[in-house]
């Protein structure tokens, strides 16, 4: 209880608030100087990703309330009662499943027709999904809207492929860090805009003439409007990044998304497969342990819903500025492979340090290592993946990375939740650090692909297959 009081009292002190304000202004100034260095093409993409994430996060925090309004206390099917919690879980799972299944397909589609038209189609699907969400009058329609949204939202790999197309290999980790900082900003502002939309929905839009209110449809309508504006922005300003001059060599055919997805499992020692596994295991270990974070902080440090916001504000601030200000310089000094290893170690140390912290100062130090670790790990792993695959297959493999990472994000919280309940409140963080450190064994030998100008032979990464091999595989299936 003392820690909780210290947190609350510290932020109510005028001196602390003035100091935090001064630091914020200084950091914003430095941030603006860095933003001005971003190439115009990437700045356009970052604006697109920011608005897309802004619309998505307008809806997600409100979803449970819409389900509660439409579902009441739940319903019975074949003698089984499905409560509100279970219904929300199914709707969230439907979105995730649609996103995971669509990610490699969107990636391969973008390899064939281009990144720009793929993003335009996906944004159109998202706009439709938001409108369905806004005007949903039943759980079935709400469920349908989340499937459409998930299918249209599997384009993270396409955006990452655009970055890889548009940057030199040595600058990709820096650019991916900028991109993730932008989406983090959308995550922070989206819920606020969603709450504003709800209040706007209660107002009469035509006072004195007729009563026109958007009501509960306001967040969906505003999110759809953002998507349409984003489509216009992309159509007008975003240039195609895909180079269609590269062609497969004679006697070789390109793998389908199904073949490539299975190859990550069947040829797990290949560089591309190892990088995808590193990403999937690490992001599952990190985000899975954070699924029970609020419960852990409450049990160990008496942090409540009134004070946990300070925790995430601290975490988010370090994350954004690390990705924008530090990541590029650290890549120049260490290289992607070494920096990703350092990131894994820092992330594992931060996660492990939380249950070992005995006071507020130690907790603050441990937590500070986590955004450093994520900033150094995930952009560097993705940048390395872009090096070991052929340009014409980037969309496919970036999409597969998101698919495997998504599966990990589904499975890991279930395991860590079980560990929290049945082993102990600190158990998820011990397991998480162990899984993170285990990924270091998958990174041996990847340094060669981080050297300037060094690209792996495509056939060594398993990206191309001879026609005879493809025919054999088709015959076996």
Q: Model-flagged regions — what are they?
A:
Residues 155-167, 376-389:
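Intracellular juxtamembrane helix-capping segments at the cytosolic ends
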């Amino acid at each position: 209880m003392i820690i909780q009081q210290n947190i609350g009292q510290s932020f109510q002190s005028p001196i602390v608030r003035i100091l935090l304000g001064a630091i914020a202004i200084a950091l914003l100034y430095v941030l603006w100087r860095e933003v001005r260095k971003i190439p115009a093409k990437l700045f356009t993409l970052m604006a697109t990703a920011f608005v897309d994430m802004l619309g998505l996060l307008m809806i997600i925090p409100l979803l449970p309330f819409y389900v509660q309004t439409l579902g009441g206390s739940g319903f019975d099917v074949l003698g089984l009662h499905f409560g509100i919690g279970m219904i929300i879980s199914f709707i969230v799972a439907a979105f995730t499943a649609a996103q995971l299944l669509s990610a490699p397909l969107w990636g391969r589609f973008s390899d064939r027709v281009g990144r720009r038209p793929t993003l335009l189609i996906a944004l159109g699907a998202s706009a439709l999904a938001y409108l369905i969400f806004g005007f949903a009058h039943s759980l079935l329609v709400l469920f349908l809207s989340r499937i459409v949204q998930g299918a249209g939202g599997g384009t993270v790999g396409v955006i990452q492929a655009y970055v890889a197309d548009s940057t030199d290999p040595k600058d990709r980790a820096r650019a991916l860090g900028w991109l993730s900082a932008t989406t983090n900003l959308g995550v922070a502002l989206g819920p606020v805009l969603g709450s504003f939309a709800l209040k706007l929905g209660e107002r009469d839009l035509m006072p004195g003439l007729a009563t026109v209110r958007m009501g509960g449809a306001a967040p969906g309508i505003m999110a759809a409007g953002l998507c349409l504006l984003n489509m216009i922005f992309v159509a007008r300003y975003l240039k195609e990044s895909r180079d269609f001059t590269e062609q497969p060599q004679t006697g070789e055919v390109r793998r389908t998304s199904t073949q490539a997805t299975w190859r990550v499992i069947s040829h797990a020692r290949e560089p591309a497969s190892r990088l995808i596994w590193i990403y999937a295991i690490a992001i599952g270990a990190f985000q899975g342990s954070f699924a029970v974070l609020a419960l852990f902080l409450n049990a160990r440090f008496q942090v409540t819903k009134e004070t946990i916001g300070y925790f995430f504000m601290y975490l988010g601030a370090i994350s954004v500025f690390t990705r924008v200000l530090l990541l590029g310089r650290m890549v120049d000094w260490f290289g992607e492979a070494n920096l990703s290893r350092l990131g894994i170690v820092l992330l594992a140390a931060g996660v492990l340090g939380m249950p070992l912290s005995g006071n507020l100062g130690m907790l603050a130090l441990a937590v500070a290592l986590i955004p450093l670790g994520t900033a150094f790990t995930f952009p560097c792993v993705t940048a390395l993946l872009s090096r070991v695959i052929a340009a014409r297959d980037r969309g496919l493999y970036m999409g597969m990375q998101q698919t495997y990472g998504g599966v990990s994000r589904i499975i890991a919280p279930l395991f860590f939740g079980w560990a929290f309940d049945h082993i102990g409140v600190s158990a998820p963080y011990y397991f998480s650090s162990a899984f993170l450190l285990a990924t270091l064994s998958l990174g041996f030998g990847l340094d060669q692909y981080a050297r300037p100008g060094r690209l792996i032979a495509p056939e060594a990464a398993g990206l191309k297959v001879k026609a005879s091999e493809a025919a054999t595989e088709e015959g076996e299936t």
